[in-house]
C-alpha cells in the first residue's frame, strides 16, 4: 500500500478525527461494537472498540487481506485509552530472511513467548490515555536475530479507545511532534493558553 510512497518522519494510518478514520481498515465485530464517540477526558472524537471476546472484535489494516502495508518506518506509535478490560494488538512484519513474523502484545498475558512465526508479550497500560511506542526493528532483532524490513499488517482488537495510530522513523520528544500528533488533555490546553 505504501511501498512506493516516500517515507520519512510520520506516516499516519488512523486518525479518529478524520472524515473517514477507517478508510484503509477492515472491521470485524461479533458481540461488540466499533464506533466513534466523544471521549470525556480529551473532549474529542475517538474510535471505541469493545467486545466480549477480544479475538472476534477488531480492526485490521490494510482492509484487503491480499495487500500489505509496505511501511519501512520502524516505530509504531498508538495513542490508546485503557478501558480496564482485556486488550490486545498484533503487528505483522517482514524480516531480512523474507519471513513474516507476528508480534502480539496483550494486557492479560504475563510472560513473553517466542515461536518461529509469532512472539507474544505482556503489555502494561496506565490508567486513562497511553502512548504505546513499539520499536519493531529492536523487537525483530531481539526475538529472531534478524533485521526488520517492513510492516505488513496491523490489527487492533477490543477493548480500547483509539486516538491515532502512526509510524515514525525514530522516537520524537513531545516538543518535536506536530500538534495533531499530540494528545492534548483539556487541562494542558488551558494551561498553554
Swiss-Prot record:
Keywords: Cell projection, Cilium, Cytoplasm, Cytoskeleton, Microtubule, Nucleus. One of its GO terms (cellular component) is cilium. It holds the Pfam family CFA20_dom. Signal peptide: none annotated. The keyword Nucleus applies. It comes from the Eukaryota. It is found in: Nucleus; Cytoplasm, Cytoskeleton, Microtubule organizing center, Centrosome, Centriole; Cytoplasm, Cytoskeleton, Cilium basal body; Cytoplasm, Cytoskeleton, Cilium axoneme. One of its GO terms (biological process) is positive regulation of cell motility. Cilium- and flagellum-specific protein that plays a role in axonemal structure organization and motility. Microtubule inner protein (MIP) part of the dynein-decorated doublet microtubules (DMTs) in cilia axoneme, which is required for motile cilia beating. Involved in the regulation of the size and morphology of cilia. Required for axonemal microtubules polyglutamylation. Belongs to the CFAP20 family. This is Cilia- and flagella-associated protein 20. It comes from Gallus gallus (Chicken). The lineage of its organism: Eukaryota, Metazoa, Chordata, Craniata, Vertebrata. The gene is CFAP20.
Amino acid at each position: 500500500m505504501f511501498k512506493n510512497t516516500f517515507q520519512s518522519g510520520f506516516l499516519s494510518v488512523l486518525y479518529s478525527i478524520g472524515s473517514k478514520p477507517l478508510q484503509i481498515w477492515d472491521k470485524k465485530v461479533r458481540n461488540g461494537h466499533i464506533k466513534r464517540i466523544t471521549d470525556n477526558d480529551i473532549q474529542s472524537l475517538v474510535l471505541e472498540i469493545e467486545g466480549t471476546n477480544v479475538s472476534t472484535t477488531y480492526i485490521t489494516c490494510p482492509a484487503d487481506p491480499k495487500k500489505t502495508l509496505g511501511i519501512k518506518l520502524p516505530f509504531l506509535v498508538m495513542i490508546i485509552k485503557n478501558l480496564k478490560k482485556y486488550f490486545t494488538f498484533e503487528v505483522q512484519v517482514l524480516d531480512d530472511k523474507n519471513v513474516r513474523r507476528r508480534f502480539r502484545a496483550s494486557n492479560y498475558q504475563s510472560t513473553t513467548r517466542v515461536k518461529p512465526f509469532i512472539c507474544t508479550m505482556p503489555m502494561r497500560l496506565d490508567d486513562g490515555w497511553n502512548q504505546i511506542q513499539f520499536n519493531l526493528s529492536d523487537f525483530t532483532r531481539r526475538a529472531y536475530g534478524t533485521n526488520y524490513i517492513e510492516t505488513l499488517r496491523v490489527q487492533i482488537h477490543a477493548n480500547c479507545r483509539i486516538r491515532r495510530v502512526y509510524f515514525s522513523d525514530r522516537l520524537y520528544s513531545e516538543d518535536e511532534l506536530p500538534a495533531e500528533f499530540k494528545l492534548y488533555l483539556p487541562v494542558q490546553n488551558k494551561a498553554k493558553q
